[in-house]
Swiss-Prot record:
Catalytically driven reaction(s): ATP + (deoxyribonucleotide)n-3'-hydroxyl + 5'-phospho-(deoxyribonucleotide)m = (deoxyribonucleotide)n+m + AMP + diphosphate
Organism: Korarchaeum cryptofilum (strain OPF8)
Family: Belongs to the ATP-dependent DNA ligase family.
Phylogenetic placement of the source organism: Archaea, Thermoproteota, Candidatus Korarchaeia, Candidatus Korarchaeales, Candidatus Korarchaeaceae
GO biological process, one term: lagging strand elongation
Protein name: DNA ligase 1
Gene: lig1
Residues engaged in binding ATP: 234, 241, 256, 286, 325, 398, 404
Role of this protein: DNA ligase that seals nicks in double-stranded DNA during DNA replication, DNA recombination and DNA repair.
The EC number(s) this enzyme carries: 6.5.1.1
CDD domains, A to Z: Adenylation_DNA_ligase_Arch_LigB (cd07901), OBF_DNA_ligase_Arch_LigB (cd07972)
Keywords (A to Z) from UniProt: ATP-binding, Cell cycle, Cell division, DNA damage, DNA recombination, DNA repair, DNA replication, Ligase, Magnesium, Metal-binding, Nucleotide-binding
A GO term for molecular function: DNA binding
């Protein structure tokens, strides 16, 4: 497939607001293309380049892309606004003639170049990435350059969300949408179904991460027990959730975003080899940093995952402990549809030191449950999760089978803009605009702003990330692609005409950076509204 064909298709998708038309265009692409070619074309169209479980990254910032494009087009780097950059590429490259004998770009060729960019490491890697970027952009026509630039920075803005891809796949292969949805939860993403030529998989596959089952929030432990009845309470650990895949001595770890994080965890791999009595297994657990039996702050734990290459000293400085709480696959048998109590019972015979099971209590008594939760809090944990005893494991679903109860009001929000601070903080972008997700429109709606809660080291890290994610600057303000998720505590939620969302957090404070969460896992505007309405009812009592 020529890149020109894909770019023209992208422009047709961009020109229509009709979901039906978008589905028709994407399904036609899938039908008429070789599975591997369609797989790569969809990754480019959606601005992913690599699927969620692939740990590779391009590491190409807007600044790098601008440098390459401006050297080819003669554009002056007057800003870093995404729209202006694309406009510059389209207009200025359009005025240049491509050599008559130059071979047209293909999707396969471009994808190989992108793979080579992701593999550039070590001294001179930046220059190598720039040289590789020059190859396609020097030959691209305006439409090809438009698609390629936006795909590289993950901003194609074609409205091709996962739901639309699922519909397109179902239409292309004549499958039921519900079946495609189920397969996506097990395989982790829709791209893999296209790569398989429409072949669906409903059972867990070893070394292929599933989407994690998620918990909804409950206002109190008492209301959670009232809703679920007799249930299991588990400690809610303040750590990094991991999916553990084991076959013999081969062990791999996947984050809740389905990224392969095995290289960061050589010490934990050894724990699994000695502490999991199974030939083959897929387990769910939580990693925490511990010292003298107590959890260390999340900010310390996350340092183990911030480097592309693990510093061996961090293994001793930040010792990790794995706690297991669920079983998905055991020696070829799927446990997805087995009830929670049966999965937990099986785990009791599988897990031994140095791995541990998350502490659990089965009860229908709110007072007994409160004692258990207070014990969890005293030991330095976040709270508890209440789990329905007969619940199956449903990948990718945030349902009412699991209810989380925490001590403080908090939301997971996304940074969409920031301002430089004052005084000592003038070096950093340290005042953050925080947004909740609107699942209907795909927008992120601002619900507050804060500069509180972070260390100087974290200000430095976020400032660097924001520069990489920039889509425009106005004075001290930087607007960014919504990628950084933070956990935010607050006193209450108020109605406010200041923001499009209609809400504003009072006394917002960032409690931690959630590197392990994707923007799609951020709290929704509906959740914000729900908390606000419960506050109002409470005040009226």
């Amino acid at each position: 497939m020529l890149l020109k064909e894909l770019a023209e298709l992208a422009m047709r998708i961009a020109s229509t607001s009709s979901r039906r038309d978008k589905v028709s265009l994407v399904s036609d692409l899938i039908r008429r293309s070789d599975p591997e070619e369609a797989y790569k074309a969809l990754l480019i169209l959606t601005g992913r380049i690599f699927p969620p479980s692939d740990p590779r990254e391009l590491n190409v910032s807007w600044a790098t892309l601008w440098k390459v494009v401006s050297s080819l087009s003669g554009a002056e780097p007057t800003g870093v606004d995404a729209g202006e950059l694309v406009k510059s590429i389209v207009e200025r490259r359009g005025k240049r003639q491509t050599a008559l004998l130059e071979e047209p770009l293909t999707v396969e060729e471009v994808y190989k170049i992108l793979e080579a960019i992701s593999e550039a490491e070590g001294p001179g890697s930046k220059g190598k990435r720039e040289a590789l970027l020059t190859i396609p952009f020097s030959r691209a026509d305006p439409s090809e350059a438009w698609l390629l630039a936006n795909a590289i920075v993950g901003e194609t803005r074609l409205g091709l969300n996962e739901g639309l891809l699922i519909e397109s796949i179902a239409q292309a292969y004549g499958l039921r949408k519900e079946d495609v949805e189920r397969a996506v939860m097990v395989l982790g993403d829709p791209y893999e179904i296209v790569r398989r030529g429409g072949k669906l998989e409903f059972e867990p596959v070893l070394f292929r991460p599933l989407k994690p089952m998620l918990a909804q929030s409950s206002d109190s432990l008492r209301s959670a027990i009232e809703e679920l009845g007799r249930c299991a309470l588990e400690y809610k650990l303040d750590g990094v959730r991991v999916q553990v895949h084991k076959r013999g001595d081969e062990v791999r770890f996947f984050s809740r975003r389905m990224s392969d994080i095995t290289k960061s965890l050589p010490d934990v791999s050894d724990q699994v080899r000695y502490g999991v009595r199974a030939g083959e297994a897929i387990l769910e657990g939580e990693l925490i940093a511990e010292r003298d039996g107590r959890p260390l702050p999340f900010q310390i734990l996350i340092r183990r995952f911030k480097r592309r290459q693990l510093d061996p000293r961090l293994i001793e400085e930040i010792p990790l402990k794995l706690y297991i709480f669920d079983l998905i696959l055991l020696d070829g048998s799927s446990y997805l549809r087995k009830p929670y109590f049966e999965r937990r019972e099986k785990l009791e015979g599988l897990i031994e030191d140095p791995v541990s099971l998350v502490r659990s209590l089965i009860t229908s008594d709110p007072d007994e449950g409160m004692d258990f939760m207070e014990e969890a809090l005293r030991e330095g944990h976040e709270g508890v999760i209440a789990k329905k005893l007969n619940s199956p494991y449903i990948p990718g679903v945030r349902g009412r089978y699991w209810l989380k109860v925490k001590e403080t009001n908090s939301l997971d929000l996304v940074i969409v803009a920031a301002e430089r601070g004052y005084g000592r903080r003038h070096r950093w972008y340290s005042d953050y605009y925080l947004a909740a997700r609107d699942p209907e429109s795909g927008e992120f709606l601002i619900v507050g702003k804060t500069f509180k809660g972070l260390t100087d080291e974290e200000f430095e890290w976020i400032t660097q990330k924001l520069e990489e994610l920039s889509i425009g600057k106005e004075g001290k303000l930087i607007r960014v692609r919504p990628r950084i998720v933070v956990e935010v505590s607050f006193n209450e939620i108020q109605r406010s005409p200041k923001y499009k969302s209609g809400f504003a957090l009072r006394f917002a404070r960032i409690t931690r950076i959630r590197d392990d969460k994707s923007p799609e896992e951020a709290d929704t505007i509906e959740r914000v509204r729900e908390i606000y309405e419960k506050q109002i009812r409470k005040f009226q009592l």
